[in-house]
């Protein structure tokens, strides 16, 4: 199990260059993982996906996702994390070498890459699709394309890294995902999840460690302190008042996004 993520600060050549220009990354010294499920929470651009990708590459996953034996580095989209990869030290009490890395933004590229490889393979070789339910994931619905690998690849010990998996999961499927995580953690004592997410549903997993990337240095927070939970709670409990205030005076954060 991954226990510590440490930034070897002497290895950083330029603190002004990306990704060290991100406050949460530049302030990182040592992050101790005390739970088998840890969530990275924070607004877009705060570094949660950047750190997750760096951990994945350091561990040996392909940059676009998949298992360690499936190295899809077909694009250069995230090579910018390399300086962080080189400066990280990961400490394990037990390292299985197994696991899965899912990047929501590039997963469909990965599926296309798998289909291309299947077309190129020798006639008697086992197609990659055989390990994903027997047919191309592109033949499934958008939600199934994401969920089927989770169902199939999580049935083992290992390190499972997921970057915003809620992007393709309905609220009902997010609940099903929580059940899947619960079953895996119960069945496999050396299974571990690190998940970058905005989902108030996923963040609500019992006794999970939540690390916030907002407001500077990394720090742990409780579920009730997460922005997604607070926003949804107020929206549900005070919808009309909340929307009136929002429309009358949109926060500067939203204006910047537009």
Identify the meaning behind each predicted range:
Residues 1-29, 34:
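N-terminal pre-Walker A segment at the start of P-loop NTPase domains
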Residues 172-258:
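C-terminal lobe/lid and adjacent interdomain/linker elements of RecA-like ASCE P-loop ATPase modules
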